[in-house]
Each structure stands twice: as structure tokens, then as C-alpha cells.
């Protein structure tokens, strides 16, 4: 056996090194399991807090937009002007372009809902062939084009939230034209129950961005807001992230809790929160490499420190055993170089204790021989 060929000190040395190595890996493994559980729990709590706070802020914003649409819906001045516009409506002609007094009355009422500070980006009332809003009035052809695109379909019975889109009626630069719209059907409740158009309450993307960009970028956590079709509401116009988040939302399904997302293309941990007043979901997501990064760094430092201590202890044991064995080596050389004429047989020795006994007997004989 190999162990029989090793000296006693070498056996102690190897056993000590193996025990130290096993201890270090056991400590690192235990620490990894404990740290993973703690990080998972911390991530769950943090994801829940971030997604809940963001969803509540978005819900308040949507409630405010809907409150304004209800106020517009019930305004008597607007109702009267819309009734007159409906009664005197001519196909292909924007009534409010031909009647500036009526336009001013409606715009004055609209401004009252958006002052003294700018609460929302824009307010508009849209007919299939008429339009009036706080901004400039586009041509009837443009209104018809937008209307016929089916932009205002799929009503839920009360109001509809459109995902982020570019306002076709805005006059500002492209980066400032991105809006989120709340649409509510409007009828002349004071005159008839006939639907006469759509109230559009627009909120700028900057407001959505302000809500969604607060206090979530920790260890590369990513926050998304998606609509019922999986389209990205925030961040806007990022094709790569849109494709990625559609895969994430498919993995989440309808679950309202934390989910380990794992596939060939994307893997990580995340949580989603469904808004109570809109078909939007807030998703907080973190990839595996970012979630496991702090854990691996901690374990790596444990292994580095433990490896350094192991090397130090191995060297200490090595030199200590070497120092202890030096007298035995000296004794062996002394006995072997003596003139007693007796050859020592070390073949049957199993341990260094046996060797020491043999050397001691030989040394005693050598001393006796010298005396004689």
C-alpha cells in the first residue's frame, strides 16, 4: 500500500491537509447556501416593496386622469357646446374650426381642469370628424386618419388606457411627444344618452418615467411596466427589452408573486404586480448573473482566505515536522557510518517509531563498541 511506504510524519501531514481542505469547502458551501437563502428573501422583500410602491404611484396617476375625464364629462358648458356641435354637424367639417366662440368656451373649460399648474400633458375631445383640445386643432383629415386606425377600440366599458405612443397632434419635438392616454366615451348626459365622442386625457411619458425610475437600480435590478399585450410602457421604445420582457411575462403568466424565470434565452428572479385600475403590470427583474454576483464574490473571498490559511498551516506543519525529524536523520547517518560492521535492515519497519527503536538499539551497540 502507498500508505505503508509513507513515513509517520508524512501521514500526519497529508491527513492534516485533507482535513483543512474539507473544512474550508464545507464552510464555503454552508455559507453559500445560507447566503443564497438570505439574498433570496431580501430580494423578494425588496422586489415586493419596489413593485408595490411603483404600482400604487401609477394607480394614483391613472385615478387622477380618470377624475379629470369625469369632470370634463359632467361639465355643463362643454355639454352644451357639444350638443350644439352635434345638432349643427356637417360631414367632413370641424364645427369648432368654423365656430371660434364655441371652441373658446370648450377650451376655457378644459383649461380650468389643468390649472393653475400643468396637471396633465393635454386634454382633448375627439369626434369621428371633429376635434377640440388645448393644443392646436389639426385638420379633419388627420382626425379621421387617427380614428380609422382603430386606436380607440377594445373598450372595457369605462375607460381605456393606451400604451405609450407619440401624440400625433403635438407640436413639440419627438422626444417630448411620447404620451400615455386615458380614453373615456362621452355622451350628452344633460341632453341625450347618445355617444358623441371620446375624452382623451394625456399624460407625458416624463411623468411615467419619473414614477418608475425611483430607487430601484440596485445590483442591476430592472423595472418594467407592460400592458395586457406584453408591450413595454416603460422604458419606452427599447426593442431589445420589449422582446426580452415579452418572454419574461410569458413565464410569469398570471401569477402575482415571485417567480424564478428560467429559459434558454433569459434566466433570473423577479416579481410582478398587477395594477388595480388598469391592465398594466409592474415587473421587477434581476438576471442570474446579477443576483448570484454578490454571493459568488463572498464565497470566492472565503476560498481565497481559507486557501491562504491552508497554505500557511501546511508550511508550518511541514517545517515543524522537518525540525522534529532532523535528530532522527542525524542519528540514522551516525549509525550507518559507524564501524560496528552491522548492517541495519529498514525493510520491515512500518512506522517511524519502529525506526527510532531500531536506531536506538543500534546506537547503544555503537556506544558499547566504542567503549570496548
Language-model region placement:
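Extracytoplasmic/periplasmic ligand-binding sensor regions of membrane-associated signaling proteins
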Residues: 115-122, 128-202
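Extracytoplasmic/periplasmic sensor domains and loops in membrane signaling proteins
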Residues: 96-103, 107-108, 137-170, 235-261
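Membrane-proximal alpha-helical signal-transduction linkers
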Residues: 322-346, 350, 360-363, 367
Amino acid at each position: 500500500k502507498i500508505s505503508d511506504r509513507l513515513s509517520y510524519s508524512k501521514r500526519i501531514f497529508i491527513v492534516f491537509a485533507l482535513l483543512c481542505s474539507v473544512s474550508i469547502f464545507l464552510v464555503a458551501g454552508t455559507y453559500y447556501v445560507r447566503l443564497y437563502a438570505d439574498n433570496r428573501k431580501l430580494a423578494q422583500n425588496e422586489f415586493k416593496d419596489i413593485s408595490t410602491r411603483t404600482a400604487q404611484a401609477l394607480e394614483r396617476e391613472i385615478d387622477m386622469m380618470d377624475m379629470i375625464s369625469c369632470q370634463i364629462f359632467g361639465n355643463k358648458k362643454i355639454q352644451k357646446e357639444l350638443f350644439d356641435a352635434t345638432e349643427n354637424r356637417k360631414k367632413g367639417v370641424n364645427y369648432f374650426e368654423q365656430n371660434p366662440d364655441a371652441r373658446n368656451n370648450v377650451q376655457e373649460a378644459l383649461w380650468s381642469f389643468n390649472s393653475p399648474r400643468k396637471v396633465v400633458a393635454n386634454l382633448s375631445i375627439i369626434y369621428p370628424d371633429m376635434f377640440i383640445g388645448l393644443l392646436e386643432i389639426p385638420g379633419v383629415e388627420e382626425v379621421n386618419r387617427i380614428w380609422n386606425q382603430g386606436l380607440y377600440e377594445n373598450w372595457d366599458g369605462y375607460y381605456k388606457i393606451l400604451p405609450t405612443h407619440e401624440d400625433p397632434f403635438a407640436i413639440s419635438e419627438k422626444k417630448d411627444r411620447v404620451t400615455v392616454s386615458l380614453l373615456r366615451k362621452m355622451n350628452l348626459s344633460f341632453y341625450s344618452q347618445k355617444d358623441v365622442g371620446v375624452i382623451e386625457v394625456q399624460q407625458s411619458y416624463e411623468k411615467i418615467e419619473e414614477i418608475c425610475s425611483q430607487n430601484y437600480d440596485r445590483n442591476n435590478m430592472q423595472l418594467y411596466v407592460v400592458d395586457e399585450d406584453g408591450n413595454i410602457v416603460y422604458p419606452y421604445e427599447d426593442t431589445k427589452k420589449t422582446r426580452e420582457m415579452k418572454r419574461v411575462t410569458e413565464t410569469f403568466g398570471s401569477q402575482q408573486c415571485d417567480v424564478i424565470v428560467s429559459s434558454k434565452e433569459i434566466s433570473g428572479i423577479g416579481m410582478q404586480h398587477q395594477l388595480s385600475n388598469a391592465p398594466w403590470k409592474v415587473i421587477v427583474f434581476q438576471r442570474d448573473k446579477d443576483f448570484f454576483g454578490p454571493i459568488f464574490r463572498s464565497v470566492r473571498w472565503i476560498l481565497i482566505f481559507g486557501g491562504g490559511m491552508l497554505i500557511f498551516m501546511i508550511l508550518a506543519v511541514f517545517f515543524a515536522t522537518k525540525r522534529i525529524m532532523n535528530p532522527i536523520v542525524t542519528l540514522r547517518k551516525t549509525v550507518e557510518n559507524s564501524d560496528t560492521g552491522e548492517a541495519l535492515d529498514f525493510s520491515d519497519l512500518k512506522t517511524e517509531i519502529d525506526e527510532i527503536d531500531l536506531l536506538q538499539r543500534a546506537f547503544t551497540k555503537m556506544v558499547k563498541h566504542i567503549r570496548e
